[in-house]
Amino acid sequence: MKALAKLKKQPGIWIINDAPIPEYGYNDVLIKIKKTAICGTDLHIYNWDKWSQNTIPVPMITGHEFAGEVVAKGDGVTSVDIGDRVSGEGHLVCGQCRNCRAGKRHLCRKTIGIGVNVQGAFAEYLVMPAVNVFKIPDSISDDIASTFDPMGNAIHTALSFNLTGEDVLITGAGPIGLMVVKIARFCGARRIVITDINEYRLQMARDFGATVALNVAPFKNQDELVKQMRKVMSDIGMTEGFDVGLEMSGINSAISMMLDVMNHGGKLSLLGISAGDISVDWGAILFKGLTLKGIYGREMFETWYLMTSMLQAGMDMNPIITHRLHIDEFQKGFEIMKSGQCGKVILDWSS
């Protein structure tokens, strides 16, 4: 089968045409891939950064955001049928630890990821345990379903706390941050402010309903950044701090600024992964009585049900997809992702 694989311990990704079709077991399904989306994690692997060097076995078929069709299944599978349109939860868990047995599979200590630790979805076929497979409603397109993984991250982050009527600060306007703007607006947030240094994506955020999309690139230090943010808050009629902070960037200055402008009793969801150490103002957390929640992946499968229901109720995520390419144009897709001048990039695996 055709696949994209990390074949060498250096920047890049390579297409192969002779990868074996994976074998499926008693409780597995074999999925024919229709669409995949390129994730920031895939870009890290492509660039072969320090995290990738320490994490990714080589050779490895990568990718974990997908939509496809069930073409075969093990004898023990009763939850899906051949012909079903599906996506799937890319975190594989042990099923035996305390959290798994308590129904908190997203907190499994032994989580491994498809396309990171085991064969991924950048291939014509993928094998996945049936328990990880999620059927796609007819009203949802393959393109949108291929983004369920990052959309689930956005849903988990945004809906960890009530957003209705609240003032929300989002730091980081990558594709997941942009999804969060859509979610917060759909859920009735009062004011939504988002920060980034990428003007292309900030304009997308404005189009998606952000009250203010602030380019923080011009500000030379933390004091200038906080001063400008307080001016923004005043300009839009805020007399107190933000009620909810959604941190998507992993950038030290963004986190510090967020802590500075949160209201007393504010709540923060933290999804962004830092490339290095983060200095934290514990005084702000303590004296403001802030609540912090770390986010890793999606709640299985409550997050999936929530995002499906919201899409069916009219939340429009189609504008997040800015580029659609055939798999043979994968190199162009990765270059577009590297440029940052995009939302989600979808790869079509049809012949």
Curated annotation (Swiss-Prot):
Give the enzyme's main class according to its UniProt record, as a single word.
oxidoreductase
One Pfam match: ADH_N
Transferase: is it a keyword of this entry? Answer: no
Which species is listed as the source?
Francisella tularensis subsp. mediasiatica (strain FSC147)
UniProt-annotated catalytic positions: 41 (charge relay system), 44 (charge relay system)
Designated name of the protein: L-threonine 3-dehydrogenase
The UniProt entry's sequence similarity note says:
Belongs to the zinc-containing alcohol dehydrogenase family.
* One MF term in the entry's GO annotations: L-threonine 3-dehydrogenase activity
Tell me which Gene3D superfamilies the record gives. Answer: Medium-chain alcohol dehydrogenases, catalytic domain (3.90.180.10), NAD(P)-binding Rossmann-like Domain (3.40.50.720)
Q: Which gene encodes it?
A: tdh
GO biological process: one example: L-threonine catabolic process to glycine
